[in-house]
Amino acid sequence: MTILIKNNNLQQLLSSWIKLSYSYTISGIQSDSRLVKPGYLFCVLKKKNINETNKHMIHAIKNGAKIILYDTKQKFKNGTLKKIINHVPIIYFFKLSKNLPQILKKYYHFENNFTLIGITGTNGKSTTTHIVSQWANLLNVKIGIMGTLGHGINNNLKKTDNTTESSANIHQFLYHMLKQNIKTFAIEISSHGIVQHRIEQLPFKIAILTNITPEHLDYHRTMDNYINAKKAFFFKYNINTLIINADDLIAKTWIKKLNHKNVITITTKDQNFNSISPKKWIHANKIIQKQNCTNIHFNSSWGHGILNSTLIGHFNVINILLALATLLELNYPITDLVKVCKYIKTISGRMEHIHIVNKPKVIIDYAHNTNGLKNLLSTLKEIFNKKKIWCIFGCGGDRDKTKRPYMGSIAEKMSDQVILTNDNPRNEHPLKIIKNILSGCKFKNKIRIIPNREHAIKFAVNNADKEDIIVVAGKGHEKYQIINNKYYHFSDHKIIKKLLNKKNYDFN
């Protein structure tokens, strides 16, 4: 077992920023009040709502926080006492959000003897992360993963709140995994995580880019801001090995500007491969897609081979090639990787098939943005080209509203039947969201509105022919529905299995 020693002396830990008169030994650091334990340093990263901030402080104190650092933008307050609650001092800390990663780095002081992989992009982060993990596991190597589907090893994952967790949670995860002698980690990197400093001070060895298309414009405001957030991970972080999908138009423009780094490109297009001329590369020169598998013929700077995979869709070809490049760069033998590729399983809620004899095939997918839905439906039209496609989807409330009409347009053009339903409406009225989606649709005769998601799925299952394809998009692996900001248990997977197994299904 790896021996790790934390820097628990608080005065010493914070000496670069503030001088404390409090001589404390801490047992941990957290920015989430729910995860605070006795003896912890709690870091209050200020929220817009001051009542929420105070509520988190009280919660942290009840959980045993020993001392609290309180974020401030006023430099003159740095290191001064804000107040004391129940014998717990609350100290102002200038730009705590920005400095917290550095404090955590000093607290854990990891030796640089492990491999940390960061995977970013609009779509495909979870799938690529899990392919890397599964593939390595098939060759008897365990990889710690952290992202949308959870954190841990292989199928033994614990729930995460965000695609990219807080800086405190990431460091804590690495610490516990290193104690178990895990030496390689793959972490999903969101644009929010980059902008909010959550991944700063982490010793990334490899950065992977899946693709860049419009997303999170409610947060970033413009596409340029979103692109620049992703770009920062490759240009501003000290990461030497960069693995890039050269089929992506935006990513392709970055490659020559990064020629001072160890850039590895993957591509499925001959013209892209010929125009880039990279030092390290993988080029899929022939792709055969079937209804239940994909064959990928590839050449590379490591050698050539044929990958057989049960994952379908061109976007999954990209994800597989990115994972392949990662493992080849980490010196996994190409022959072994080719041999075991066929055993990689479908990732939960990502192009996941549920099929029972004499019933329509149902596909669950997390596609929740314009490009994701387009790729999903175009793949199904190509592979199941003579079958009728039903598309059930909605758009999240209190999120990017600009994508709604585009998603409506894509669904009606690429599906035979469309059912608009709820997908985490949050604080928005469900019918208002559906109206926004409908504004992009021209042929409303093929569209049905059933806000209750369970009812929508039931309607499709009961009315689709056994040869039809039903696509349930947007929620994927999620096991909840958010309505009026309350979480209700809901699983597409569970509902579909129940419906397909029962002829006469009654709603609860």
From Swiss-Prot:
> Which EC class, in a word?
ligase
CC annotations in GO: cytoplasm
User: Which residues are involved in binding UDP-N-acetyl-alpha-D-muramoyl-L-alanyl-D-glutamate?
Assistant: S33, N162, T163, T164, S190, Q196, R198
Q: Which residues carry this modification: N6-carboxylysine?
A: K230
Q: How is it modified after translation?
A: Carboxylation is probably crucial for Mg(2+) binding and, consequently, for the gamma-phosphate positioning of ATP.
Protein family according to the UniProt entry: Belongs to the MurCDEF family. MurE subfamily.
Name of this protein: UDP-N-acetylmuramoyl-L-alanyl-D-glutamate--2,6-diaminopimelate ligase
User: What species is given as this protein's source?
Assistant: Buchnera aphidicola subsp. Baizongia pistaciae (strain Bp)
**Which gene is this protein's source?**
murE
